[in-house]
């Protein structure tokens, strides 16, 4: 009963009710204006015409244009108004202004720290053009001198994650889409409290929508009371606006600038299988011990300072000593930004698919992509590339699952192999090609990740973990789908 009441009076329910109330109010006001119907209808039709013209001139993916133009033309009275409310990126002006200029000090911070290289370090090697693109459009340089560890399950990440939190001496930076009180988050929080007492600087960013069901509205104030610097990213305002877009979907943990984690896991019990709402939960992660961790420090501080603008001298967070590590390949951490026109995550995935010579293996919880991505996957299979995609057998969102399944037949007909992870839900976000290149991070293969969210990942080339990622992708339990396919939830 208590759980039901908590659900009924949760922030998300209240927010949705307030939005619904505003919609009803708007419809009532329109009804009151029925005596001016001709004038109101003319204005709304004009608004729809302007919206369509704006979309036609806008530099965005054609499939996104079409997704808006068709309903606007079908429902011209309300279509333009809905586009005005929901068709734009809406961000705080301060954040937008800062993020547009954040890349200006990327190279300087990296190079002054003497930890990074330009992409020319791999010139002549297969992924050079991809690394060069990511350098030019994300400000991401290339790192060596880093020990890399791959984890096929969140359960595997957890012990090392806890040990590294406990070992931090100077600072801990955490940035996650979801924090949810339970064994995982409560354990992390107790460690963070102890670290604050030891004089370690602790900062936390969580996404307000991602955590809306789990923590109170002003949870960040509770964290501040413990001495943890904290902020809720892009806080929910229950007005007719795009509250579900432009979220901070990144997963970043940095300890002392020497150790960093990223991957698909959040700070909630299902990610380490302490609870099982959808069967066995599979999520992967990567640990970087060495120079590449510094880049994740920069990525965290970029976003932090876009809100608070506290740190004038980011190099003060640079590790005092650069330890020598075995050079386990080349790493290029990157982040995507919905304020930019460049869909970096989508382009990285597409380029890896187009460049593949032998195979493309993909883990993704969702598969809702544009026509260009579908064409790239189908064309790769048709030219003899072994293309395999692993998606969940048990969905976390049934509607999204059906949308994912709607792509299967078209891909199967082209020769793409589709597998469903039979033990439960796969939340890993990973793409692997040709025994030498992988990208691991927070990016789903859907348009929300590609176009609407802040995401992160790391390109890894010529590393020992490539074989581990391949083994993971080939050894998971799955059902191989074939035509004809009956798609049921």
Regions found by a protein language model. Give the residues of each.
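Residues at the starts of beta-strands that form the adenosine-phosphate
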Residues: 201-202, 386-388
């Amino acid at each position: 009963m208590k759980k039901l009441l908590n659900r009924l009076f949760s922030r998300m329910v209240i927010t949705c009710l307030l939005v619904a109330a505003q919609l009803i109010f708007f419809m009532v006001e329109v009804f009151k204006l029925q005596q001016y119907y001709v004038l109101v209808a003319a204005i709304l039709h004009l608004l729809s015409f302007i919206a369509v013209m704006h979309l036609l001139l806008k530099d965005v993916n054609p499939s996104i244009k079409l997704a808006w133009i068709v309903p606007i033309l079908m429902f011209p009275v309300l279509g333009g108004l809905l586009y005005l409310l929901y068709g734009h990126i809406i961000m705080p002006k301060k954040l937008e202004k800062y993020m547009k200029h954040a890349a200006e000090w990327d190279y300087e911070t990296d190079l002054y720290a003497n930890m990074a290289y330009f992409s020319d370090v791999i010139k002549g090697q297969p992924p050079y053009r991809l690394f060069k693109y990511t350098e030019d459009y994300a400000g991401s340089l290339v790192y060596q001198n880093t020990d890399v560890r791959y984890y096929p399950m969140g359960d595997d990440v957890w012990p090392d994650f806890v040990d590294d939190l406990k070992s931090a001496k100077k600072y801990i930076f955490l940035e996650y889409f979801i924090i949810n009180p339970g064994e995982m988050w409560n354990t992390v929080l107790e460690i963070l409290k102890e670290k604050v007492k030891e004089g370690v600087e602790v900062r936390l960013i969580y996404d307000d929508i991602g955590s809306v069901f789990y923590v109170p509205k002003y949870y960040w104030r509770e964290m501040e009371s413990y001495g943890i610097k904290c902020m809720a990213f892009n806080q929910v305002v229950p007005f007719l606006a795009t509250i579900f877009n432009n979220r901070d979907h990144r997963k970043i943990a940095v300890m002392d600038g020497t150790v960093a984690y990223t991957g698909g896991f959040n700070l909630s019990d299902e990610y380490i299988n302490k609870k099982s709402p959808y069967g066995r939960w599979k999520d992967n992660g990567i640990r970087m011990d060495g120079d590449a961790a510094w880049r994740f420090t920069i990525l965290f501080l970029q976003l932090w300072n876009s809100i608070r603008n506290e740190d004038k001298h980011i190099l003060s967070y640079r590790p005092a000593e650069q330890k020598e590590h075995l050079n386990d390949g080349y790493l290029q951490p990157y982040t995507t930004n919905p304020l930019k026109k460049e869909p970096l995550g989508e382009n990285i995935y597409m380029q890896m698919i187009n460049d593949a010579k032998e195979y493309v293996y993909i883990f993704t919880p969702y598969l809702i992509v544009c026509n260009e991505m579908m064409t790239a996957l189908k064309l790769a299979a048709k030219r003899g590339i072994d293309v395999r995609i692993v998606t969940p057998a048990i969905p976390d969102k049934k509607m999204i699952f059906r949308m994912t399944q709607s792509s299967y037949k078209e891909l199967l007909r082209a020769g793409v192999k589709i597998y469903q992870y039979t033990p439960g839900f796969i939340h890993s976000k990973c793409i692997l090609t040709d025994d030498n290149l992988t990208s691991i991070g927070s990016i789903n293969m859907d348009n929300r990740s590609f176009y609407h969210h802040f995401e992160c990942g790391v390109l890894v080339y010529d590393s020992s973990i490539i074989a581990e990622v391949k083994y993971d992708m080939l050894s998971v339990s799955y059902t191989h789908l074939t035509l004809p396919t009956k798609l049921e939830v």
